[in-house]
């Protein structure tokens, strides 16, 4: 058993206007971000809301998928269902302990991010340097509560619509 409980980490791609979604999808295309997401979440439990699961279309391989929903009839093939954040995090902690990993990855959506933010210790943030139309937004962070510990800037490319930065924030 790992004596240190796993860190709760948010994984979010956010535009300059705090946009994170449009019509259940990302409002941009960044292949590099998809590869980064896969790299940082692989082997770790991922927790998401029902709408995020539906937008993915399937459970993501190589990770324990936990879906939060109040709809007790909803079925997410290949995922563990949880009907509260507390239940979902308890399942994620067990999965992290069994896998020997030190992070629980929260991957969305808007309501899940907002609810879990007070418990989060780390944020893997992809800053998308654009301001697209959106209908889903990320919570405004209090800059006094977070410090940047990593930044890697990228120019747009053939499979990346916009310039972007990979940023890691740690709670102060």
Question: Which sequence ranges carry the predicted segments?
Answer:
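Flexible, gly/pro- and Lys/Arg-enriched active-site loops
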Residues: 3-7, 11-172
